[in-house]
Amino acid sequence: PSSWINREDVEEMEPNKLVSWFLISSYCYYELGRSIMSDLSFDYLVQRLKEHWDEVTHPHKELITQSHLDATTGYDIKFPSIVKMSGNEFLREMIKV
């Protein structure tokens, strides 16, 4: 499949989960060259993240700047190991399906 996280998945995400998937999706796209959600789903994730930003308590919140959200990109983020591991694990699991 070309993408695995859809708009309905994004709709159900809690604010902290939006941060996780922003980072994981950006890592997969920019570092691995793999898209795990459509551009429209990612744009929707960013929209929801902006709307719920003040509710976010995720420890990696500080990695995401307003300019990342405005440009809907995380291309220059230095991804923590846990994001890399999560992205790689997600891709491995989805390939099995």
Give, region by region, the residue ranges found by the protein language model.
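Phosphate/adenylate-binding "loop-and-lid" substructures adjacent to NTP/NAD/dNTP-binding pockets
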Residues: 1-97
